[in-house]
């Protein structure tokens, strides 16, 4: 098992610990203090940067921007009081299921 596999859980726990912190104490606390609309703006910006890096950027740029997108997605989950485990469970549920079959099941 790669020691990096738990980093998203660890990061999410740090994000949760910043929810009640002073906005001056960290970028995460500041973002959470500004609310969901500001976080959504950042998620949108980061998603756009992933697309740009994926289209014409280097591998390093794509990795960097994807990390930013994952981080801001976790901040959004924390702001909405959604446990990161809910996402991991959804990914597990989908694992091994054809994307076509899974998408068709959502339409029912």
From Swiss-Prot:
Entry keyword set: Amino-acid biosynthesis, ATP-binding, Cytoplasm, Histidine biosynthesis, Hydrolase, Nucleotide-binding
Pathway: Amino-acid biosynthesis; L-histidine biosynthesis; L-histidine from 5-phospho-alpha-D-ribose 1-diphosphate: step 2/9
EC category: hydrolase
Organism superkingdom: Bacteria
Any one GO biological process: L-histidine biosynthetic process
Catalytic function, reaction form: 1-(5-phospho-beta-D-ribosyl)-ATP + H2O = 1-(5-phospho-beta-D-ribosyl)-5'-AMP + diphosphate + H(+)
Keyword match Cell membrane: no
Matches recorded under Pfam families: PRA-PH
GO cellular component: cytoplasm
Enzyme Commission (EC) number: 3.6.1.31
Alphabetical list of Gene3D superfamilies matching this protein: MazG-like (1.10.287.1080)
Keyword Hydrolase: yes
Protein family membership: Belongs to the PRA-PH family.
Protein name: Phosphoribosyl-ATP pyrophosphatase
Gene: hisE
């Amino acid at each position: 098992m790669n020691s990096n596999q738990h980093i998203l859980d660890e990061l999410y726990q740090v994000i949760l610990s910043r929810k009640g912190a002073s906005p001056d104490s960290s970028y995460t606390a500041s973002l959470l203090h500004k609310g969901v609309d500001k976080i959504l703006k950042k998620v949108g910006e980061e998603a756009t940067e992933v697309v740009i890096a994926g289209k014409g950027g280097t591998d390093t740029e794509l990795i960097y921007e994807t990390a930013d997108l994952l981080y801001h997605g976790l901040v959004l989950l924390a702001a909405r009081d959604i446990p990161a485990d809910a996402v991991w469970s959804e990914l597990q549920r989908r694992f091994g299921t054809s994307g076509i079959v899974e998408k068709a099941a959502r339409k029912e």
